[in-house]
């Protein structure tokens, strides 16, 4: 990863933050994106290589072409795009406002594919690149109280499995990561059925693996060029 440019969304905390610090320790240039610029600055201070902070809201997709241009102006290439940003949900389907379903699809699906489509021409011109999308076990199996989240993650998987087949001829690799329970703030930041913050750390999340362990599993999977990368405890076996 020496001198490679790696763009990570959702980089202000959790898995994204751990990935940024890990890849920096391996010599990569790091582009940090999320909505929280203050937290991104803290992450940048923990990176030992060149960084670029690009504040990004996955719901504001019109900003993505300009953001991509800024990355290319700074680092010339985009070698890896890690689609990690997103939001979860904790509510029964019958108690979830349709606006919440739409918002999760807007951020997790449309936001992710819009940024990918902004970056793809750069990788195509380079004739190389690797796109890694952090899905979830909920992208493989439906999960209690996560109907909207699972639907968006299933959509992600369908898109990126198709993209892998299309971009193989351009020497662009596509990997999908399926984390199990990782101790991050995803459940606290998840939306309730009304769209308010859930604000509670799930028991399974609390007992999950560390973001650092998950980041190492992802790095190993990328090095092995795996199409599917799994990380977690007994739930992934």
Locations of regions flagged by a protein language model:
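Conserved glycine-rich Rossmann-like NAD(P)H-binding loop of the short-chain dehydrogenase/reductase
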Residues: 26-43
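Conserved glycine-rich cofactor-binding loop
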Residues: 12-13
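SDR active-site lid
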Residues: 169-233
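Active-site helix of classical SDR
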Residues: 116, 152
